[in-house]
Amino acid sequence: MEGRRLLHVSRLVLTRVLHLATAALIDGGERYAQRAIREMLAAARFTDWNPSHYLDVAEMTLALAIGYDWLYDQLTEAERDVVATAIIEKGILPSLDPAAVPWWVNSRNNWNQVCHAGLTAGALAVAERDPALAEKIVARAVEKVPLAAGSYAPDGAYVEGTMYWGYGTSFQVMLVDMLEGVLGHDGGLTAAPGFLASAQYILQATGPSGEFFNYADARADRPFAVPLFWFARRMDAPGLLRTDLANLDGALVSIRATPSREVARLFPLALLWWQPEFLERNTAHPETQPLHWLAKGPVPVGVHRSSWGPDAIYIAVNGGCPASPHGHMDGGGFVLEADGVRWAVDPGMQEYHSLEKLGVSLWDRRAEGERWKVFRLGPEGHNILRFDDAPQLPEGATPVVGFRADGDWPHTILDLSALYADQTTCVWRGVALCQGGGVLIQDEWTAREGGDPEVCWQMLTRADVSLEGNNVLLSQSGKKFHLRIQEPTDALIEVIDVSAPVHFYDVPNPGLSKIRVRMRAGSGREGVLRILGATTIAALATNIPTGPLATWA
């Protein structure tokens, strides 16, 4: 066990069984099958699969279901009995206790997708032994998974962020394949609003550097996206695979360097979904993908890039409230790239176990909750606006109030007022990609009467930072990027080293600095902060939008 989780063990079993069973089917060699069977029998003999944390059960059930189905002919009758009994008694039945219905059954996050898919795999694998049980589990999944599929609506941006898109979506596409393969229908799961569009979301949330726009609980390192192979086949869209095919060699090196290999536990499924003709066609599509993209929803995302090349200018911004599943205090947060360098960074999530083992109340999402004191989860670790260094409010909608994909300055504008309602009456953030080669981040606010909070604009970077007047020069990897505080001209600019842990439970952030721009809000007054960015000084003054955000149409 790792804390309260057996998940790393379940994932190790899934990794081994899926890879070995795939090798056995391709090679026909008995040695792969027998090793997979040994893994299955060992897991089947566990006392239980830790139903107190049902993700562990779901992934273990999936592992044994795949092995039972794919290696059925290699299993002896006695081995089939052992594995099938474990699937039913340790995988499925604990979820059917009428006195204690697991919370995930009706949840709206990735647990729903993972658990229902894993148990459906088990139920279908052993359906000949208990048809009524299989029918019950399948019917439950078809009824309940749409609750979580709402996370894609309306345009594909997954509420829990890019990393958990990979987790929840992997299991949902497996569930669809199971239903179609066995029952001939998908239960309507692919018709969920935004579900198919979420493939475009992952494409857009991958920056020119190859890193993720890693808002919420996510890492910047983009893993090999196995589900995209399913989407590419489903939609006949080989362009979706451009990044993964280009980085395949690097992905394999990373996989081999990871002892548990759990990061690639579903890798063989890419082989099943791969279409050989895509190899010739996948390079023909990238230029047809949009340069400017918006997804509305509970956690809206706006993306703007100058091209699909590796040196493109790229800025992506997210809304959303911190109390969302796997949310951070990052409403209005952004990442920024140019010349192949990520200049504005999100340091990413901190592993749960590292916090839980030290007693951090990680899932307390109240405004005063301990979750928001963790550097990487709270306001300190994000590129956001703050008032008197206070945290954002954890609840509230952040709607898109403006978006444009053409003209001299394609842009996204978010209404972040709900996140600062205790100190302001209105807060908007707009980001624009200017045709002259620059970007503009413009914030506008109205402080409440009787209050005069200090406004702080903050941006995290791993670049070397130098200040001169109202200009900031970033240097990294032999490249340079310029920031200019255009308005107001008298704002205070400072740079703080945030590489060392703030609290005993925080992890280090090597090379990380925070740029802060400070000014007074003014009681009851409307305020504005305009910050320009570009790779050259000349681009800072070319085709820049002027005026309030409301006039950017």
Specify the residue positions occupied by each region the protein language model found.
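Beta-sandwich/jelly-roll carbohydrate-recognition scaffolds of carbohydrate-active enzymes
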Residues: 1-4, 290-293, 298-301, 440-441, ...
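Aromatic-lined, polymer-binding surfaces characteristic
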Residues: 2-212, 218-219, 428
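Histidine-centered active-site/metal-ligand motif
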Residues: 56, 111, 164, 325-331, ...
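A residue-level signal for conserved active-site and pocket-lining positions in enzyme catalytic cores
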Residues: 64, 119, 304, 443, ...
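Replace the tail clause
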Residues: 74-77, 293, 474
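Carbohydrate-active enzyme catalytic cores, enriched for enzymes
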Residues: 103, 126, 167-344, 402-409, ...
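CBM-like, beta-strand-rich accessory domains located in the C-terminal region of large
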Residues: 249-258, 262, 354-553
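Terminal accessory carbohydrate-recognition/targeting modules of carbohydrate-active enzymes
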Residues: 306-379, 527, 533
